[in-house]
Swiss-Prot record:
Protein name: Phospho-N-acetylmuramoyl-pentapeptide-transferase
Any one cellular-component term (Gene Ontology): plasma membrane
Protein purpose: Catalyzes the initial step of the lipid cycle reactions in the biosynthesis of the cell wall peptidoglycan: transfers peptidoglycan precursor phospho-MurNAc-pentapeptide from UDP-MurNAc-pentapeptide onto the lipid carrier undecaprenyl phosphate, yielding undecaprenyl-pyrophosphoryl-MurNAc-pentapeptide, known as lipid I.
Species lineage: Bacteria, Bacillati, Actinomycetota, Actinomycetes, Mycobacteriales
Chain segments annotated as transmembrane: 3-23, 54-74, 79-99, 118-138, 161-181, 197-217, 238-258, 262-282, 290-310, 341-361
Organism: Corynebacterium aurimucosum (strain ATCC 700975 / DSM 44827 / CIP 107346 / CN-1)
Cellular location(s): Cell membrane
């Protein structure tokens, strides 16, 4: 537990003190966010706001993971595990893609940033590499960081992507990894449209995963082989990463809350999407993440609906997509949209954690007959 607290605290401190350094640098050099002319008119005042604040979040996560890991090694706990390093690598890799996108926008003055093909190929390479490696590195019990079985709270034995054999199964799994990682990274990116929205929602999701992965560690089959135990390779290291993500988002949110003094940019949003995807895969909760991260799902679905309806009928289903802009254009203040969406995200996360805990009660036999 101390290791997890250290990760959250260190990440928060690094992010909260690094962010103003970025604000000063980008303000002094006159490099700031461009604002869409077709967006909400109230957003035009944000033109020139410093961006790439995701660097502070990533710095917090990286430093916290190393510090907490060193503490873990000194105290005899697991640290720098295959699961943790793979998730961290995915997070930093997608952060690098986002950084390239932001860099081109700010320093090369190309408003569209990294072209779609380059971004697509970069995400594809990272997803395939993560998917390939996550099925390697078995521990003494034969557990790998990921599994070809679809997982809700535990692996679903009836839904194995490798049912067609090793070769076909691996191909199907890699395709699934790409869809999953691209979906979550782009979902967080779409949510990052209002001051504090993406950082706040991600903090809620990471807080939930800090609790759940710690619970998986406490009742791991590796140390406590009993009814209801969890077959997860490195739950404590995942809890450390989730806590680091929570701390980093909160430290950044201090400066990103309305009126934002800095935006996270694609550097932050793509990286945090990778963190969400990676932890869901390695904690064996890919499907549960749909509930816990429901706000991200809603934002993404609203864009899909808008595109499909517009191409089918020539009319818009929402005033503007993603859906947070729909409410803005309907007269809601930006802060009202953000706080209400935080509340929705918190309710979804609580529902997910409740389902997770309810499953443990049932699987362990404690909830039987209650």
């Amino acid at each position: 537990m101390t290791q997890i607290i250290i990760a959250g605290a260190v990440s928060f401190l690094v992010a909260i003190f690094t962010t103003p350094v970025l604000i000063r640098y980008f303000s002094d050099t006159g490099r700031g966010q461009e604002i869409r002319e077709d967006g909400p008119k109230s957003h035009l005042r944000k033109r020139g706001t410093p961006t790439m604040g995701g660097l502070a979040i990533l710095a917090g996560i990286l430093v916290a993971y190393v510090v907490a890991g060193l503490y873990g090694l000194l105290t005899g706990h697991e640290a720098f595990t295959a699961s943790g390093l793979l998730v961290l690598g995915l997070t930093l890799g997608l952060g690098a893609v986002g950084f390239a996108d932001d860099f081109i926008k700010l320093f090369r003055h190309r408003n569209l940033g990294l072209n779609k093909t380059a971004k697509l190929i970069s995400q594809l390479v990272l997803a395939l590499l993560f998917g390939f490696l996550v099925l390697r590195f078995p521990n003494d019990a034969g557990l790998t960081p990921g599994s070809t079985k679809l997982s809700f709270i535990r692996d679903l034995k009836t839904f194995d992507l490798a049912v067609g054999g090793t070769v076909i199964g691996t191909i199907v799994f890699l395709i699934f990894m790409y869809i999953l990682i691209a979906a979550w990274s782009n979902a967080v990116n779409l949510t990052d449209g209002l001051d504090g929205l993406a950082a706040g929602v991600t903090a809620i999701v990471m807080g939930s995963y800090s609790l759940m992965t710690f619970w998986q560690f406490r009742y791991s089959c590796a140390t406590n082989f009993a009814a209801g135990c969890y077959q997860v390779r490195d739950p404590l290291d995942l809890a450390v990463l989730a806590a680091a993500g929570l701390g980093g988002c909160l430290g950044f949110l201090w400066w990103n809350a309305a009126p934002a003094k800095i935006f996270m940019g694609d550097t932050g949003s793509l990286a945090l999407g990778g963190l969400v995807a990676g932890i869901s895969v390695t904690s064996r909760t890919e499907l549960l993440m749909i509930i816990i991260g429901a706000l991200f799902v809603i934002e993404t679905v609203s864009v899909v609906i808008q595109i499909v309806v517009f191409h089918s009928t020539g009319k818009r289903f929402f005033r503007m997509a993603p859906i947070h802009h729909h409410f803005e254009n309907g007269g809601w203040a930006e802060t009202a949209v953000v706080v209400r969406f935080w509340l929705l995200a918190a309710m979804a996360a609580m529902a997910g954690v409740a389902i997770f805990y309810g499953d443990w009660l049932t699987a362990s036999g404690i909830g039987v007959g209650a």
